[in-house]
Structure formats: C-alpha cells, structure tokens
C-alpha cells in the first residue's frame, strides 16, 4: 500500500463527484485506465448512459438496485441495498487485487464509513489490496479518522 497515491475529496457531495469525474477524464486523457464505483446514490440510468460513452478508458459501476439515494429508502430497502453495497465493496477489492486499472474512484465511499457499513478492518483490507502503481480516490461528505492514515491528499470542497 502506497499512501501517496490515495486522495480524498470531501464536502458537498455533488461537488466532490464532479471533481472526481473531472479528474477521471483528465487521467484518461493521459492514458490511464479508470474505474469509478459509485455508492449510496441510487441507480441513475441517465448518468450511467452518459458515462458509458467514455468507455473503455473510463468504466462506471453502480451496484445499487434502487433509483433512490440510500438515505431515502425504508429500513427494509436499506438492508437489501446494503448487500448490493457489499458487492460493490468486494468488486473494488477485486479491482485492486488484479490491478485492473491505474485509477480507482470510489464515489460516495466515505458515507459507508460514516454509516458503519464498512468497518476499519474492511478499509484496511481494501487498502492492503492496493498495489503501488494504482491511484485510489475516495469521495463523500467527510473523512473518517480511520481513513486518514492511508491518505496523502485531502481536498475539502464547499459551496460559498
């Protein structure tokens, strides 16, 4: 695990996602292969269709089954969606283990830590799967203290 290649964008969620997408496009323009995995934001078909046009350089995945954001779901729906989130987390780990991309963006991931859907041990397992050549970017509202030891750069984005 090489912390100087781990970045966090935190703050206003729409802004952090936009910044991460901009970075993904810039990286792809420099020849990097990019995978974006989105968490907690629901299944957004229109956005996914647009992002599919960036393939094969930028690939986008969402394991959500509901159209709604996670916070808008009933408790029963949230339990169901948590299984899908776990699938997304396991896929992220697989991407890191196999070195499938040079940049992995985990959009909304910080919310998984905030909501205790992912433990500090899960995070450690994920970060230990990362090779030195792979850059990882996390986005979300705020950074959990358990993540700080893995991160070189933290960018806080807020509207004025």
Segment roles from a protein language model:
Residues 2-94:
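Conserved P-loop
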Residues 61-63, 139, 157:
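Conserved beta-strand termini and adjacent loop/short-helix elements that scaffold enzyme active sites
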Residues 53-55, 131, 148-149:
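Short, well-ordered coil/turn elements that cap or connect secondary structure elements
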Residues 148-160:
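A short helix-turn-beta junction within AAA+ P-loop NTPase domains corresponding to the substrate/partner-engaging
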Residues 140-144:
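Short, polar loop motifs at secondary-structure junctions
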């Amino acid at each position: 695990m090489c912390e100087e290649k781990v970045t966090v964008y935190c703050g206003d969620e729409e802004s952090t996602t936009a910044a991460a997408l901009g970075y993904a496009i810039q990286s792809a323009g420099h020849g990097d292969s990019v995978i974006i995995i989105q968490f907690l934001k629901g299944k957004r078909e229109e956005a996914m269709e647009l992002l599919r046009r960036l393939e094969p350089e930028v690939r986008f995945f969402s394991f959500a089954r509901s159209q709604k954001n996670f916070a808008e779901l009933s408790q029963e729906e949230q339990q169901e969606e948590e299984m899908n989130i776990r699938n997304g987390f396991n896929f992220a780990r697989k991407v890191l283990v196999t070195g499938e991309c040079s940049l992995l963006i985990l959009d909304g991931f910080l919310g998984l830590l905030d909501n205790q859907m992912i433990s500090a041990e899960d995070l450690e397992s994920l970060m230990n799967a990362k090779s030195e050549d792979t850059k990882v970017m996390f986005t979300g509202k705020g950074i959990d203290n358990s993540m700080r030891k893995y991160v070189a750069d933290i960018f806080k984005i807020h509207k004025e």
